[in-house]
């Protein structure tokens, strides 16, 4: 599904100066969300496509802003508030808006998913972790550059690798199974197996260059 009016509103909430949390990231996650929805439909898994779409669209909105000075405890809470204002302002159903807000909060590192929509949004957001290593590495480099820009601090490649690996592991505490293809023939989560393989390769990677 597409909502061109809301997409035009959402894109204004993503700063192109950000190397990772920009609207290109949203386009990628929307694509991953569509794949998840398609697999759910094939297996008869109930997922509200509108909730997933709108939650992904706004899940990193306002990322460059200082959420603390705006009265929010996390970037996810701030993004969720921006989503609620945009969706309510355009006449969307209150219950749908509530579910979108919840699904955005499910992308927080410490969150536990309560619904299939929560799982779909979190899984789509994290899909790049289990992608080909070239995609994984580009994302981690973009995140490093973004971190340095936002914090005003330089960090060595080795320091970043350790920080990033520890952070990624925090996102692996929960299975996000919605469809049968989530597990491999050995009953292991493909997402966890592929992500941990990327982490191991990343920790051994001496080069900060994408093609290195």
Residue ranges and their predicted role:
Residues 93-97:
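Membrane-interface starts of transmembrane alpha-helices
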Residues 16-28, 65-78:
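Active-site metal-coordination segments of metallo-dependent hydrolases
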Residues 29, 49-68, 79, 100-108:
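His-Asp-centered metal-binding catalytic motifs of divalent-metal-dependent phosphohydrolases/nucleases
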Residues 17-48, 58, 92, 109-212:
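Divalent metal-dependent phosphate-bond-processing catalytic cores, especially two-metal-ion Mg2+/Mn2+ enzymes
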Residues 1-12, 25:
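Short alpha-helical hairpin
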Residues 29-30, 74-90:
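An active-site-proximal "capping" alpha-helix that borders the catalytic cofactor pocket
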